[in-house]
Amino acid sequence: MRVIPLASESLGVRSLATFVEASGIKILIDPGVALGPKRYGLPPAKAEMEVLQKMRRKLQGYARRSEVVVISHYHYDHHTPFFEGLYESSSESYAREIYEGKPLFIKHPRENINFSQRKRAWAFLKNTEPIAGKIEFADGKSFDLGGVELEFSPAVPHGSEGSRLGFVVMTLIDDGSKRVIHASDIQMLNRKSVEWIIEKVPDLLITGGPPTYLGKRAEGSWQAGIKNLNEIIRETGAEIILDHHIIRDKNYPRFFDELEEIPKTFAGYLKVEDRPLEAYRRELHKIEKGGEAEIPFKLS
């Protein structure tokens, strides 16, 4: 099995897009890239916009190769919408290239879903139903792809129990020799998702950490995330790729150090430098205006 992390916060954008080739079947999970429209009261810096375009080109390249598409939920950093979006680098042609003629395994568009995601799911289905090979509402189901089992969790909270952000589904890919779980926006903050991961005993877990960058709005999430991740590490022995929300916090290396096994970011897994651009947006704007600011990565 070949696992290729495509785009994420450690690579400069909001995403957890991943390409998996298992027994010759090419699977694209959460094909979206985006930028936070406001951070520290600032719009994306020029460096972020450039990386967004680069990540979009990379994502489309892997979309052309992929045969199966999985969507965990309907936030725009996890799927590509059909509209022209500046901070999503989206368009109808990009979306068609990703979804046309392919089987889509997607989070249920009407059950266990909040109002915002329900609207987005409606728009997504309106555009994909005429062009997709087939569409499966995947929550809690398993599918045999011919030597590869694709298993989906029931809908679990996007973050902590009772989250207003809705629900997501996790994906297990098993080719008989390796088990990989992609668990996008669980944020390591709810028991249901932690217990499902432990029950499935993955060899590799690709997941996002808690949104500690939100400060008081995410109070207690640091400690809860550490506790839950350490439990998964102890109970499964899985290799962990940890990225997404936690990398929007400049203090994420300290979070990694508090874990019993230090995970890799997407960048670390690809053996390139972490470039958490959003976390350093204030500094990037200063540099782009000709000022000086310290950042822990190279800009090009």
From Swiss-Prot:
Range of residues in the leader sequence: none
Pfam families reported in the protein's UniProt record: Lactamase_B_2 (PF12706)
Superkingdom per UniProt: Archaea
Record-linked InterPro entries: Metallo-B-lactamas, RibonucZ/Hydroxyglut_hydro, UPF0173_UPF0282_UlaG_hydrolase, UPF0282_hydrls
Residues in coiled coil: none
Protein family membership: Belongs to the UPF0282 family.
Protein name as it appears in the record: UPF0282 protein TON_1363
The organism's taxonomic lineage, starting at the top: Archaea, Methanobacteriati, Methanobacteriota, Thermococci, Thermococcales
